[in-house]
A protein has these predicted regions:
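Extreme N-terminal starter segment of soluble prokaryotic enzymes
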Residues: 5-11
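Active-site donor-nucleotide binding/catalytic segment of nucleotide-sugar enzymes
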Residues: 11-13, 129-188
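Active-site and donor-binding regions of nucleotide-sugar-utilizing enzymes
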Residues: 12-125, 131
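A nucleotide-sugar donor-handling region in carbohydrate enzymes
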Residues: 103-159, 272, 276-281, 288
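Catalytic donor nucleotide-activated moiety binding site of glycosyltransferases and closely related
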Residues: 175-209
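Leloir-type glycosyltransferase catalytic cores
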Residues: 181, 260-304
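Donor nucleotide-activated moiety binding/catalytic core segment of transferases
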Residues: 195-231
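Conserved donor-binding/catalytic loop of nucleotide-activated donor transferases
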Residues: 218-220, 238-242
Length: 304
């Protein structure tokens, strides 16, 4: 017999991947801000055990923790556990990103627009992946961020082109001090040949912790992000910064480049080639906070 579910309890399944945790924790935190909840983080079950639970076995699972109003997760390894948890203890099963299982199995699927989700009652389209960043009221016009990614499935790389773009950005406004950081994908030789410049501090990813970037985004009035690092583009937008896109070669027109092109057309970001050198990047007029928008929809739909 299922225990009575409470909207005050959220189970968050984590596969341990930073990008997935950023999304699921972002939604859980947003729910907590709107309506205080207890967030319980759980490891996903092995697939065989999750399937057994779905078929009515594993009756002792999760009996020692409060029943959830919501179970949520991001990443393929969490999908069966979401369904098993709902089967065993109740609650609404919410999956972030397009699942590998049929969409109809979940109460709600939060899927980025660039994944072209179908129009269904249990599908909410998001602008990019959700994240933990909060809109900031402490942005400083004299602080800028340069966020460097690396080669990916959709983009190749060109150090020299990036060096030229970075030099132009630094030279354009002597009132801004820039902080540059890298990612796990950044080629090792990128920093080796990056020219030193006044008003530029370089902090490699190896010298940062999980809270470093959110702290920087809370203060930076401008952020330039390489096109491959689309998740950081959305994080910078959520913080409220004026966002520019550093251009790297695309392997082909793809869903990521199409998503960035759409953001530029809507005035949220500026590509380097479209940036007038004598002007500062403009901040978007609206608020970009997809985690809160989705959390508000969930509460109004099920827990109002």
């Amino acid at each position: 017999v299922k225990s009575r579910a409470s909207p005050r309890v959220v189970w968050r399944f984590s596969d341990g991947k930073a990008g997935h945790d950023n999304q699921s924790q972002g939604l859980a935190d947003a729910l907590n801000r709107l309506r205080p909840v207890e967030i319980i983080t759980l490891d996903p079950l092995p697939a065989v055990m999750a399937l057994s639970a779905l078929w009515g076995g594993q009756r002792a699972l999760w009996r020692n923790i409060p029943a959830p109003g919501i179970v949520l997760g991001a990443g393929h390894r969490t999908h069966l556990s979401l369904l098993a948890a709902r089967r065993m203890r109740g609650g609404k099963a919410i999956v972030l990103m397009r699942p590998s299982l049929p969409l109809c199995l979940f109460d709600l699927c939060l899927i980025p627009a660039h994944d072209a989700p179908p129009a269904r009652p249990n599908v909410q389209v998001t602008r990019g992946a959700l994240n933990r960043i909060q809109p900031s009221s402490h942005l400083e016009p004299g602080r800028g961020l340069l966020l460097i990614g690396g080669p990916s499935a959709h983009f190749t790389w060109d150090n020299l082109s990036l060096y030229r773009q970075i030099a132009a950005i630094i030279a354009a406004d002597p009132a801004i001090h820039w902080t540059l950081t890298t990612s796990r994908r950044t080629p090792q030789n990128f920093l080796q040949h990056l020219a030193c410049a006044e008003r530029l501090t370089v902090i490699p990813i190896t010298e940062t912790g999980p809270d470093w970037l959110p702290a920087q985004l809370a203060r930076a009035g401008q952020a330039w992000v390489t096109a491959d690092s689309v998740s950081m583009v959305y994080e910078a937008l959520t913080a409220g910064a004026a966002v520019g896109v550093l251009e790297v070669p695309s392997r082909r027109m793809n869903r990521v480049t199409q998503g960035l092109t759409r953001l530029a057309a809507e005035g949220w970001v500026t590509f380097f080639t479209d940036w007038p050198r004598d002007c500062r990047l403009h901040r978007p007029s609206g608020i970009f906070n997809e985690a809160e928008r989705c959390a508000r929809w969930i509460i109004e739909r099920w827990f109002a």
